[in-house]
Amino acid sequence: MNQFFRRVLSGLALLVAVVGTTGCQHESQAEQETVRTVSYRAVLESNKPVPEKVDTWIAAMSQEDKVGQLMMISLHGSTIGQSQKDVIRKYRVSGVMLTNENLINKNQVKTFTSDIMQTAITSSMVTPYIAVHRDRILHGNESFLRLPKPNRWGQLPMDRIINLATRSAIEMRDMGFNLVIGPNANLGVPNMSYTSDPTWAGHINLAMVERYQINHMWFAYNYFPAVTLGDASFGSANEAKAYLSNNDVAVFKRLIAQTTANSYMLVMSHIQIPAIDNEHLASSSKPIIDGWLRKELGYKGIVMTDRIDVGALQSNQKIGDYAVASILAGSDLILVDADTIHIDEVHRALTQAVADGTISTERLNESIKRILLMKMQTQMDP
């Protein structure tokens, strides 16, 4: 009899264990199903305020998605074939910047940008930046409105600048771009700067970006804090900052103060200013990005690097290591060229840095939040 009861009790215990385990499995599956049903499009199209949308999506994002949002890449070719789609999907990148290699004619460009967007949407990715550096488009390219060379803009009257900027913004928008790398805020750089006058440079930049905003395009002022110091040398950080604050940085200060938040980003140059940071280029310098730009000048938006392979070469570092250093210094978005080896190396380095805590979850989420605060602005939805 005792043996009988022992068997019954054992059976009941087993039944309870099975039921309990099954319940846990159902609960786990339900939780997983809940996660699966939270889509980027659903969050984006909800009636929540943008900051709430951002927090909701950050909580739902995988580490893979977050790391991808730190990368803006370029692609080879004039069409989006399977290999290009595979790169976009594999690395789940924040955006794609088209270069002259990708720009053949208007219809081809429209198809190219549309295919990028559709690849992202069908892969449940965050809205991608589809960017073009307008000042770097070759003048012989018949696909685009012929604009003045950069160093000629400053010689034009304001009504002409506004007219050309308006036509260019409409053209880029209609081709499928949503981000312009530009305008340029630097002073006195041959073949790059619009003018040497900081006041006039500010006027030109603000006039251009007003046309971009009207046509629902994001933009990126470049290059902070400067691209050259000429013959200037400095004995201290304060001396260097004072000099630049009367030159290029004077323009950036005005642009930061007078431009709508979350509509633009700043691009870092690869200049080195030893008086401020004797070890790092500006694009990987915490004293310049986090200290000067963010804390002293009060800039709260996205910081993007210029091409990271160039910075890595100048600093004699591996491209992946340089990308990690740039994020740790305060950058949010790493610009990578079309070399798939470079893309993979940067992605691997960032993934490893997040996994081992070199880039903390808090630091990672800071960048993701800045990027999403821009991308989730409703007027910019694809």
Over which residues does each language-model region extend?
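Bacterial N-terminal signal peptides that target proteins for export
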Residues: N2-S10
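C-terminal motif of bacterial Sec signal peptides marking the signal peptidase cleavage site
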Residues: V19-G23
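N-terminal hydrophobic targeting/anchoring segments and the immediately downstream early-domain regions
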Residues: E27-I130, R134-H139
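Short, well-ordered coil/turn segments that N-cap beta-strands
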Residues: Q69, S94, S124-P128, G176-N178, ...
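Enzymes and membrane/adaptor proteins characterized by extended Gly/Ser/Thr/Asp/Glu-rich
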Residues: V87-I204, Y223-A240, S269-S284, G301, ...
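Phosphate/pyrophosphate-binding betaalpha-module
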Residues: A207-M208, Y212-Y223, L244-S263
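Catalytic PLP-binding core of fold-type I/II PLP enzymes
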Residues: D290-V303, R307
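Mid-to-C-terminal alpha-helical segments outside catalytic/metal-binding sites
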Residues: Q352, D356-P382
